[in-house]
Amino acid sequence: MSALDTSIRVEVKTEYIEQQSSPEDEKYLFSYTITIINLGEQAAKLETRHWIITDANGNTSEVQGAGVVGETPTIAPNTAYQYTSGTVLDTPLGIMHGTYGMVSESGEHFQATIRPFRLATPGLLH
């Protein structure tokens, strides 16, 4: 792990979107707001994303692609980039984690880790 790997901090807030969910059809919609903070000394551009999404039944799906929400932001040192997206699960509980493929101002490619976070309907867990 290089210093660049630890120069990006990822914070996550999740929300269950009850009005767009349909539990009787096993469809649970969650939004997640991601804040990507550049703690390093160089600007870093987010080029790719790789998500691993697992529901409570152990079913896993992967999402890979360029950028996030149609953007490939460059995050200056000591600044942050925030976006909101969503996912649909077949269960009221799930976990997401993954990586962002980043490139530093000097052209070095590195991975920013997105630590596992929980998606859960309110009142499901105590």
From Swiss-Prot:
GO biological process, any: error-free translesion synthesis
Protein name: Protein ApaG
Membrane-crossing segments per the record: none
InterPro entries assigned to the protein according to its UniProt record, in alphabetical order: ApaG_domain, ApaG_sf, Uncharacterised_ApaG
Position of the signal peptide: none
Domain ApaG: 2-126
Gene that this sequence comes from: apaG
Organism domain of life: Bacteria
